[in-house]
Structures are given as structure tokens and as C-alpha cells.
Amino acid sequence: MSDLRDVPERDGVPAATAPSPSRRGLLRLGGGLVAASAFGLSFGAGGAAAAVPAGKRFSLTEPSHDLFRHAKLHDARVQQSFTFDIVNRRLFVAQLKSGSPDDSGDLCITQLDFSGNKLGHMYLLGFGHGVSIGAQPVGADTYLWTEVDVNSNARGTRLARFKWNNGATLSRTSSALAKHQPIPGATEMTCAIDPVNNRMAIRYLTASGRRYGVYNVADIAAGVYDKPLSDVPHPTGLGTFQGYALYGSYVYQLTGNPYGPDNPNPGNSYVSSVDVNTGALVQRAFTRAGSTLTFREPEGMGIYRTAAGEVRLFLGFASGVAGDRRSNLFYKNVLI
């Protein structure tokens, strides 16, 4: 497979020109509606001691670039998340399974090439909403990480690791799954993998609130859960949560809603960066990536490193009409 191509996205604008987030775009976390402002945000109790080496972060006000637009997934519903295997140069996109109830936890994973052409698919039954997935290369194989064991809120309660197997259908009780419960008492959890540094961010919910924990991927895969590198509160008041990614010492979040009468173009999509050692919101910027798309719902984030060594922060957007939703990926590549 060829490497990711570089096609400029022309409609990115700095945050200074962006509209303020709408009241409709506020985020419900912990049962409370929190008023949003760009930096007047609330956090829970203090996080773990800093253990993730500090490094560069992506500039979120730089314009975005296209990878592809209007890619057709195996099923017809909106994408929820995506992930890259940067060793074997593979891309996987998650969506809810067509024909299944929204609360079933049934997912479809589509493998695409970097031009958006379909290469394969898997079905996962009883897993979750597909909020975030991760890919772990093992030689020439790819192992996927997803949420599993769907709850009454249509979210997974544990993590599952399994080998990508084109055309297969796995139930939540399949022997092909290795299940993990790294956070005791968590009622929801998903993960995102930093493929450059081989670390994993786990976004989880307990009775005390929602948080991010950062671990080494190898530790979680081995069932070693008592070595978190950091653990910080999840920021509130940023808008409707739509995905996250981990790179270095920062978690990146995507928020916003699809276009509609209450959210016309240019929409209310924002990208933010959070220091995983302190929980501090470092930057928040409005994004117009893919602003000309129809529907344009922000859906998913990911990290990729090209063969030449350039690291990219990807943003996903769903487009199209009901019954024919499409996948669209854009990226930022300026580190500061």
C-alpha cells in the first residue's frame, strides 16, 4: 500500500475567526450540563504524578489537509472512529452495524486503503458504540483494541484485543477475544493508541466521574494494570464529545455536532489538546476541515506516522445522507 499522500485542505481557519460554541453543543458529563467557555473549564480531583515524557504538540490552528473524502464503508451508517497500524500501513474505521438496534453494541469495522477504497470488513456483536478503537501491529498482523461487553447505555464496559480477520464475525463471548478490565469500578471504557510511542489512553467512567488514564500498551496487553503513567480528569464543557487521540504527553479531543437548522455551516467543531500529566487544557481551536461536506458530523481521531517520519493528527467527519453515509479524513501536521 502506498503511503499517505499530502493534499492541502483549503478551508481551515484559525480559532480567532470561529463562532462561539452553541448552547446545544454543550457536553453532558456526570449528569450535569456545564456551561462552556474556551478556557473556563472544570476538572475533578488531582491526577497522577507526571510520568509521560513531555514533548511537542500539534498546533491546532494550522490548516488541515485532506486524506480522502466520500469513502464508502462496508455498512451504511456514520463512522464512529478509526485507527492506523503504522507498521503495516493499514487503516480501520468503526461504525454501528446496519440493521442492528442502536443499543445492541453491534459494530462493523471496515479496512480501507489510503485512497478510501474498501479492502475488507469484520462484524463485532455486543461490543459497544465504537467511540474509539486502536491498532497494535504484531509482525505482519494487526490486533485491534475496542470496547466490549455493551451496557444499557450502549457503551462497552471492558477492553477487548483480537486479531484482524477479514470477513469474520465475533460475538462478545468469542474465544478469539482477550478481555481487559484495567480500571476497577469503571462502567464505561474505550481506548486510543499512540502508535509512535506505544502508549494507550483509556477514557473511562466511574462513580466519581470521567477520566483519562495513560499506560504502556504492552502492560495492558500483558494484564499489568498497576503501572499507570498518568491519570487525569476529563475536561468538561467543551461540546458534544466525538473522539480522541493520544500522542506524546497530550490527549487530543474532537467535539461538535452535524450540520442542521440549529448548527449551520461552518458548524461548531472544535479540536482541543490536554496535557496528560496535569489535566490542563493547553489549546482549543475551531476547525473548518471539510466544511463543504454535507451533514458533516465530527467522528473520530487518530495518529499516523508516514514512512518519511512525519507525524499526523487525523480528524474524521461523516457526510452524506441517511442510508448512504460516507467517511472523510483530514489531518494536521505542524508540531510546536
Where do the language-model regions lie?
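Beta-strand-rich domains and repeat architectures in extracellular enzymes and scaffolds
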Residues: 71-100
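Blade-loop segments of beta-propeller domains
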Residues: 116-141
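Loop/turn-rich, solvent-exposed surfaces of beta-rich toroidal or solenoidal domains
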Residues: 236-273
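Beta-propeller domains
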Residues: 92-123
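Beta-propeller blade signature
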Residues: 106-114, 157-166, 214-217, 266-277, ...
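Structural signature of eukaryotic scaffold interfaces centered on beta-propeller domains
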Residues: 76-87, 132-140, 185-197, 243-247, ...
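N-terminal export leaders
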Residues: 23-31
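N-terminal secretory signal peptides
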Residues: 1-21, 33-41
